[in-house]
Each structure stands twice: as C-alpha cells, then as structure tokens.
Amino acid sequence: KRIWKKALLLVQFVATGFLVTMLVFVARQYTFMVNDRPGYAYENLAYCGLAGVDSTSRAKILDEVMRLPGVAAATTVYQLPFEHASGNNILLPGGTQELFNIADLYWVGNGYLDMMEIPVIQGRSFTENVTNSREVMVDRRFVEKMKLVAGWTDDVVGKDICVTEHSKWNEEPFTICGVYENIRLGGISNQDMRPSVLFYAHKPMYTLQVKFHELTNDNMARLQQKISETFPDRELSAISFRSEIMDLYKDSRQFRDSVMIGGLVTLLVTLIGLIGYTNDEVSRRRKEIAVRRVNGATLWDILRLFIKDIGYICIYAVILGGGIAYFVLQKWQ
C-alpha cells in the first residue's frame, strides 16, 4: 500500500512539473508574440472599415477626424498589414514571363509610411496629391528577389516593373520611387514571407487609419463618436491596432489559460495527495517518532525523516515532467 501511494505521488509530481514547465514556456512565448515589433509602430494606431461608404463621404470623415483633438495624423488605406494580403505577379516591361508572386498591399494615402514609422531605406516616398500615380514602392525582400531572378543590383529606384491586375497586360509599367524596410504581414505564426509592394491613391480608400499622440479611452471615444455622427445609419466601429494584433494570438492565449488552469488543479491535487501521504506516514511511524522525541530529537529532525523519504521522489518527478514538457514543446513549435 505504501509503494502504491508513492507511485501515485510520483505521477502527480510528474504532472505538476510538466504543466508548470509548459505554462512558463507558453506564457513567455505569448508575451513575446504580443510585444514583438512587426516593423511598424502600432501602439497609437486605430482604424475603421469604410466598406460601402462612397468616396465623398470617405473624404469627409477623413477631414473631420484630422481635426479631432489628440489626433496626430489620419489617412486611408486599402489593406492593413495584419490582414491576409492578396497576391499579384511581377513582370518586366515588354516581357511575358511572370517572375514571382508578391503580397499586394494595394493603395495607401498621404503620409502612410510616416504614420506607420516604416523607414524608407532607398529613394523616397510617394509624390502625393497626384490623381493617377504611376509610382510603386517595394520592400527590401523585393530588391533581394529581383537580384536573384532578374539580375538587378541593389539600386532599384527609377526602374520600371509591371504588376498583374495593375498593369493591364503589361502595357502600363510602374516606376519604383523608393524601397521601405520589411514589415511583418500577418502574425508571427502565419507570417507572409512574400515580397510586398505599395501603390499610392489620392482618392480615399476603404479603411480609415488614425494615429493618436496617445491612444487613450477618451481619444477612442471621440473618434467613435465622430464616426457615428457622420454615418448615423451605419454601424461602423473604431478598433485599435493593438487589440487586433493581440487577437491574432488568441489561440496561444487560450492555450496558456488552459495550461494555467490545468496546472493549478494538478498542483492542488498534488498538495492534497502529499498531505494525505504525510498523515498516513505519521500514523504508521507514530511509535518511531515517539521514541525519537524521548531520545531528544527536535521537530526539524522529525521533519527531515519525511523530507528524505519523499524529497528525492519529488525532485526526480519534477525534472522528468519538465523534460517531457520540453520535448512536447519542441514538437509543438
């Protein structure tokens, strides 16, 4: 019976070591995910989808929002960086061979790169307030890809490319005006590694993007109020970038919470089992304890009997549980 209780205690400590180790690693991974820099500054950004809103109304809300207190900048975009990006293919002017597929971020408005704090590492940003812009910006990955497939050098500014969907059968090339630093498209676990491109649009696009001096509840409330006043017949919501980015990792958060609950329950069961085992041992060894007390043993001497009895079991069990957790985490990642 005593051996059976020790075996059960061993299993409980292995489970505790496993779940505690899992919790530490998963919690650290989740913290890393939500605090990692994606290549753009999102802490003070918010957005509002304007799908179905006409161009005149989009221009109106953009103008109204820029006058709100606390707003540092506002623009419109077609694509948000954490959304899934559509693809188009790259060709050289006059050529028919499609070189590679890119993540097309489509159109952005005035001041987009400054708002996002995305560095321009070569050339310049778009010429703004142009009705039919023929400029395109590419990221660092695009430059590296063109060096491999087309033999280009690092200096790509001023060169022309054609992009399917935009260039109409390779008849309307775009001129590269600048190169921006790579940014993360999507989340860490499902990052889109394709090169990306940006186009400029003077006409307001379908997503309003706002940058605050500081993103506070009051500033978000004012933005939401202005949107609701401008479009009383529509249910449009202002959403912070941070909440959307955290939502990318909700599965990891839920897994972390599940492991935490499981770990706490297992720890509680283990403590109950340890207390029960200790009580049984005290009852079983009552005469031995009495003799030791008569011979001058202190309370600490008595406690050492039980610590020595189960201490090695606990240590080895926790190490074993941690090792199993590490193996599982390697497979999971």
Per-segment meaning from a language model:
Residues W4-Q29, R253-K287, I315-Y316:
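Hydrophobic alpha-helical transmembrane segments of multi-pass inner-membrane transport and secretion
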Residues K1, M33-A41, T298, G321-Q333:
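Short juxtamembrane loops and helix-capping segments at transmembrane helix boundaries
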Residues L99-I102, D114, R124-V138, G158-N182, ...:
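Beta-strand-rich non-transmembrane domains
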Residues F18, R28, K308-Q333:
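Small-residue-rich transmembrane alpha-helices
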Residues A27-F100, D104-W107:
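Membrane-proximal extracellular/periplasmic loop immediately following the first transmembrane helix
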